[in-house]
Curated annotation (Swiss-Prot):
A lipid is attached at residue 211 (S-farnesyl cysteine). It catalyses: GTP + H2O = GDP + phosphate + H(+). The modification Cysteine methyl ester is found at residue 211. It comes from the Eukaryota. The gene is RAS. Its EC number is 3.6.5.2. It comes from Colletotrichum trifolii. It is found in: Cell membrane. This is Ras-like protein.
Length: 214
């Protein structure tokens, strides 16, 4: 039976312009695909879900990818609990920008690790692919986080991308709590939370989940 305690998760979707951040977010929240491209400055959406039998209120911030809005990034990076680092598989430039976002998040948070998921969007456009799946997996592994390919248009792995970051926030918080109380966290080591075991983490299923729009 799902827990009735409503825990809010502040999720931030980051990435370059035109990679489909808004399309992913709207597909999650409203279950439809927005075809036209209207550059986002900043939009916030809320949705209640049950993820692994725990109630979660997702507070999703869809951010601007354009360089002219980069000054706003540190503000939302300070408040975010988990980040989806989104690039388009049809744009190598957007893939190369992901490391910049990851490094900026760690600098703002003053951490060696923080909950993130690398998302290769537009996987329905296989014929236009510029970034291989193996490259995406390797980048995520170097960050110590999960990797997933999605399609907002075809609704492939959209829910799973957001649910995976919630799962990682939960894991991170459990280890933080263990570290702060001196028990060493889930890893059993006296130290701050470590990046997840990506090899084992990939075995998690995207089931046991349902959502309500708030």
């Amino acid at each position: 039976m799902a827990s009735k305690f409503l825990r809010e998760y502040k999720l931030v979707v980051v990435g370059g312009g035109g990679v489909g951040k808004s399309c992913l977010t709207i597909q999650l929240i409203q279950s439809h695909f927005v075809d036209e491209y209207d550059p986002t400055i900043e939009d916030s959406y809320r949705k209640q879900c049950v993820i692994d039998e725990e109630v979660a209120l997702l507070d999703v911030l869809d951010t601007a990818g354009q360089e002219e809005y980069s000054a706003m990034r540190e503000q939302y990076m300070r408040t975010g609990e988990g980040f989806l680092l989104v690039y388009s598989i049809t744009s190598r430039q957007s893939f190369e920008e992901i490391t910049t976002f990851q490094q900026q998040i760690l600098r703002v948070k003053d951490k060696d690790y923080f909950p993130m998921v690398v998302v290769g969007n537009k996987c329905d456009l296989e014929g236009e692919r510029e970034v291989t799946r193996q490259e995406g997996e390797a980048l995520a592994k170097s960050f110590g986080c999960k990797f997933i390919e999605t399609s907002a248009k075809s609704r492939i792995n959209v829910d799973k991308a957001f649910y995976d970051i919630v799962r990682e926030i939960r894991r991170y918080n459990r280890e933080m709590q263990g570290y702060s109380t001196g028990s060493g966290g889930a890893s059993g080591i006296n130290g701050p939370p470590k990046p997840m075991d990506v090899e084992n983490g990939e075995q998690e299923a995207g089931c046991c989940s349902k959502c309500l729009i708030m």
